[in-house]
C-alpha cells in the first residue's frame, strides 16, 4: 500500500517480516546473507521480499521446522490486515558470494532496529497520523553496495526531521553512508 495512505492500517512490511525470521535464525544458528531484497518504491510499503542465505547443511531440517512455525505464527499475526500473506522457503544453488558474518550481523540488526510505521498521532486532528516512517526498499546493487530506502512523513517539520535522524542513526551505527533527499 501507499505509505501515506496505508501506514495507519497496520499493513505488514515484507522486509520487516522476512528480516525478523532471518534475525532469529542468525541469533540461533548463525547464517550468512548472500542477498536480501524487497520493496521497490520509496512511497510504498514493501509488499514482497526475498533473501538467499547460507548456513551449515546440518541445520537444514531445523531451519525448515523453524520456518514452518514462523510462517504459521505470521499468518496468525497478520490474518486481519494481510489475509493473503504468503511465506515460502526453497533450496537454491550455493551462491558465489555472501556477506561476511560481521556484515550479516550488522545488516540484520539495522533492519530489525529500523523504525517502521506510525511514530505519532496528531493531537490537533484526532485519528490522523502526524508522523510516520517507511522502510521502503532494500536492494543489493553493484560494487558491493546495499541501497536501503526509507521515507518519512509528518505534518510537523521538526518531527519529520526527528524521525529521519532516528532512522539515519540506526544505519550510521553500522557504518553506512546516509543521504537525505
Q: What is the meaning of each model-derived region?
A:
Residues 1-153:
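Midchain, well-structured core segments that form catalytic/ion-binding scaffolds
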Residues 158-177:
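Redox- and metal-dependent alpha/beta enzyme cores, enriched for Fe-S-associated oxidoreductases
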Residues 179-181:
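Short acidic alpha-helical/loop segments enriched in Asp/Glu that coordinate divalent cations
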Amino acid at each position: 500500500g501507499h505509505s501515506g495512505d496505508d501506514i495507519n492500517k497496520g499493513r505488514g512490511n515484507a522486509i520487516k517480516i522476512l528480516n525478523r525470521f532471518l534475525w532469529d535464525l542468525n541469533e540461533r544458528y548463525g547464517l550468512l546473507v548472500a542477498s536480501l531484497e524487497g520493496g521497490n518504491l520509496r512511497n510504498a510499503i514493501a509488499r514482497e521480499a526475498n533473501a538467499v542465505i547460507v548456513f551449515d547443511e546440518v541445520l537444514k531440517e531445523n531451519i525448515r521446522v523453524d520456518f514452518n512455525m514462523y510462517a504459521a505464527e505470521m499468518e496468525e499475526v497478520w490474518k486481519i490486515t494481510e489475509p493473503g500473506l504468503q511465506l515460502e522457503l526453497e533450496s537454491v544453488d550455493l551462491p558465489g558470494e555472501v556477506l561476511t558474518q560481521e556484515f550479516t550481523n550488522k545488516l540484520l540488526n539495522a533492519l530489525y532496529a529500523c523504525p517502521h510505521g506510525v511514530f505519532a498521532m496528531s493531537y490537533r486532528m484526532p485519528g490522523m497520523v502526524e508522523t510516520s516512517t517507511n522502510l521502503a526498499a532494500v536492494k543489493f546493487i553493484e560494487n558491493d553496495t546495499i541501497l536501503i530506502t526509507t521515507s518519512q512523513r509528518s505534518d510537523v517539520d521538526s518531527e519529520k526531521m526527528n524521525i529521519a535522524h532516528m532512522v539515519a542513526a540506526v544505519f550510521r551505527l553500522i557504518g553506512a553512508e546516509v543521504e537525505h533527499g
